[in-house]
């Protein structure tokens, strides 16, 4: 028999079909040109001063630290096995291993970045062992500093600093007698008979490994992702907790771009990234592979089955089972901000392609404090550094709830929270207090037939503070003098709280005063001498000085955690998000079509509920809107925890 197929003379063999990455055919298979290579080299040179590449010496140090940690895990598991009288043959091969995930596993970590790690143990080692005997073993290591266990977290973790490198270690116990060296965590069968905490702990590694297996060229993917992550951080849209995207979500968007342009290199992929996602028809989901059902009865993202999934505005679905939406925190405002940034990025990268701009322009930070005319400033304060660290973490995790509430106001088009926090000026120089601020930019909508806009935000701010205080008390975190403050400032007044180098523009204006007067237990009257207002009562506070103004404040709200912030008599500003049409600004026509997901129904965003406001041009009365038929509903008292 002939070893090869016989063909007719002169006949041409059909070209082998290119491998398809992802759920659709690629948009382009074009190979890189010399100009693409030159632009990629320039991109690398531009990235270097930003510290996105780690020195070889530092990389080797990380590898050595992980080897030491891996040896500690093996030694610890062997000791546990011996204490439980396992057969010697099992003890000799019991194994155990440290896996990494996140930016380090993806190969895009920056200088000084921490390492996300997972300790995988066999079935006879449980979570209690991890948080007791392994914790004690780490405590004995002279290289280990700042060791702390967070057992009650959604994903329990041990945090430490190993020889100067911060490491977060999760734990997963597999239903295996031994842990082999070549264990592939992408194997879905490993999830059988695991508790939900182990499944959550495994998820990071499984998603990271799956992403790396789904991109055509890992080197091009990594360089593109480094550029996009830096761009997102420079443009203040890198924060999962505040409703933007986190590292894994950015990685999946870049991976999808790589799938659509499998032969492209970084300079092209960065530009195509902005092209694809500035035109993406949200809320159609971004998928790296077809979702698969494994019959393990684990909850997965599926808007056909789960009604809550239909309300996700910008779904980016993890490729590993059980599939989840990594962007469930995205709000109307954060999506608007990101889409506009995508359009800006497309316009800039086209200028770079035409040699009209350098790569450095892409990484120029926009002037957040010159972009809007109205801002809400949130301030969290605590008397000690340790309390402040916990308090700030809780407040920050709830800011997106406030943003969502502000978005429902008919006169607020957009509420843009800056992910960067700032130290706040001290209330008094001789008082020890730790304070952090966040700033939310507002785009306001002009009312019909009026040049004056009055908005009462009392209920929105009060609901936000109630939520924060209630969770702090229920989790036993709350301490006396933990406070939240809020105030409205115009752009010209930001200098009162922020230094000039942050504002990037020096302005001088008169300070205006604010008075807060509690009228009754069921209403709150704000007498305002300016267009600013703020309060910051602690849920346990009696009469004490306000954190910013020194004005008296007291425990007068039925919720004990009332904070009123309002904007009144605002002249409508000529401010809005800058809309950039990348086609008009670049003078090109987009001929590429962005593939949409077949078989996936378009999900309509939820309708905006109407909010009633009681507003006066001189004062605001706190009558929170309530559902009809529930006029007697009371806000729970956070002190009593009811």
Curated annotation (Swiss-Prot):
PANTHER family given in the database record: POLY A POLYMERASE (PTHR10682), POLY(A) POLYMERASE BETA (PTHR10682:SF19)
Cofactor(s) listed: Mg(2+); Mn(2+)
Stretches for region Disordered: 530-553, 620-642
Assembly and interaction partners: Interacts with GSG1.
Binding site for ATP: 101-103, 110, 114-116, 168, 229, 238, 247-248
Nucleus as UniProt keyword: yes
Enzyme class: transferase
UniProt protein name: Poly(A) polymerase beta
Taxon lineage: Eukaryota, Metazoa, Chordata, Craniata, Vertebrata
Site for Interaction with RNA, residues: 154, 159, 329, 400
Residue ranges that the Swiss-Prot or TrEMBL entry lists as coiled coil: none
Residues annotated for Mg(2+) 2 binding in this entry: 114, 116, 168
InterPro entries: NT_sf, NuclTrfase_I-like_C, PolA_pol_cen_dom, PolA_pol_NTPase, PolA_pol_RNA-bd_dom
Organism: Mus musculus (Mouse)
CDD domains hit by this protein: NT_PAP_TUTase (cd05402)
Main location per the UniProt record: cytoplasm
Catalyzed reactions: RNA(n) + ATP = RNA(n)-3'-adenine ribonucleotide + diphosphate
């Amino acid at each position: 028999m002939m070893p090869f197929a016989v063909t007719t003379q002169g006949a041409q063999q059909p070209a082998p079909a290119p491998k398809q990455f992802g759920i659709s055919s690629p948009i382009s298979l074009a190979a890189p040109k010399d100009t693409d290579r030159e632009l990629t080299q320039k991109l690398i040179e531009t990235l270097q001063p930003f510290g996105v590449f780690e020195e070889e010496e530092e990389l080797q140090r990380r590898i050595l630290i992980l080897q030491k940690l891996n040896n500690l895990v093996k030694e610890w598991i062997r000791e546990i096995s011996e204490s439980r009288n396992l057969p010697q043959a099992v003890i000799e091969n019991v194994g155990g291993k440290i896996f990494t995930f996140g930016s380090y596993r993806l190969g895009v970590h920056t200088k000084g970045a921490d390492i996300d790690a997972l300790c995988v143990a066999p079935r006879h080692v449980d979570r209690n062992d991890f948080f007791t005997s392994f914790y004690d073993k780490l405590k004995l290591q002279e290289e280990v500093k700042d060791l702390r266990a967070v057992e009650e977290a959604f994903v329990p973790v041990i945090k430490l600093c190993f020889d100067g490198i911060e490491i977060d270690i999760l734990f997963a116990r597999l239903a295996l007698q031994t842990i082999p060296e070549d264990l592939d965590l992408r194997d879905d069968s490993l999830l059988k008979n695991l508790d939900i905490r182990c499944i959550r702990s495994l998820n990071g590694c499984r998603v990271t490994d799956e992403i790396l297996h789904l991109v055509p060229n890992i080197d091009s993917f990594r360089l593109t992702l480094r550029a996009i992550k830096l761009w997102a951080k420079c443009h203040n849209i890198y924060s999962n907790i505040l409703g933007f995207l986190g590292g894994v979500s950015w990685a999946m968007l870049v991976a999808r771009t790589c799938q659509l342009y499998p032969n492209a290199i970084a300079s092209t992929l960065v530009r195509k990234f902005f092209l694809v996602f500035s035109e993406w028809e949200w809320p159609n989901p971004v998928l790296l592979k077809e979702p698969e059902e494994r019959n393990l009865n684990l909850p997965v993202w599926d808007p056909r089955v789960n009604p809550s999934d239909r309300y996700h505005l910008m779904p980016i679905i993890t490729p590993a089972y059980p599939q989840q939406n990594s962007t469930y925190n995205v709000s109307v405002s954060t999506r608007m901000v990101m889409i506009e940034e995508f359009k800006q990025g497309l316009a800039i990268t086209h200028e770079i392609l035409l040699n009209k701009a350098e790569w450095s322009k892409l990484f120029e930070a926009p002037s957040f404090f010159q972009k809007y005319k109205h801002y809400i400033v949130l301030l969290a304060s605590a008397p000690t550094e340790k309390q402040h660290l916990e308090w700030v973490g809780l407040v920050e995790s709830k800011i997106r709830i406030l943003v969502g509430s502000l978005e429902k106001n008919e006169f607020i088009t957009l509420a843009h929270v800056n992910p960067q926090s700032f130290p706040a000026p001290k209330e008094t120089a001789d008082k020890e207090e730790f304070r952090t601020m966040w700033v939310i930019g507002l785009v306001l909508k002009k009312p019909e037939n009026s040049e004056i806009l009055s908005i009462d935000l009392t209920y929105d701010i009060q609901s936000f503070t109630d939520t924060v205080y209630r969770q702090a008390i229920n989790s036993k975190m709350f301490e006396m003098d933990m406070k939240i403050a809020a105030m409205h400032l115009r752009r010209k007044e930001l200098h009162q709280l922020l230094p000039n180098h942050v504002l990037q523009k020096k302005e001088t204006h008169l300070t205006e005063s604010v008075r807060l007067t509690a009228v009754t237990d069921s209403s709150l009257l704000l007498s305002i001498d300016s267009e600013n207002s703020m309060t910051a009562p602690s849920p346990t506070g009696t009469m004490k000085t306000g954190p910013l103004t020194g004005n008296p404040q007291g425990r007068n709200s039925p919720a004990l955690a009332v904070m009123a912030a309002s904007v009144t008599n605002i002249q409508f500003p000529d401010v809005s998000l800058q809309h950039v049409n990348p086609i008009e600004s670049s003078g090109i026509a987009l001929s590429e079509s962005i593939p949409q997901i077949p078989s996936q129904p378009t999900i309509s965003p939820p309708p905006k509920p109407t909010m009633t406001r009681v507003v006066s041009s001189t004062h605001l009365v706190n009558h929170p809107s309530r559902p009809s038929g529930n006029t007697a509903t009371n806000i729970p008292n956070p002190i009593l925890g009811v």
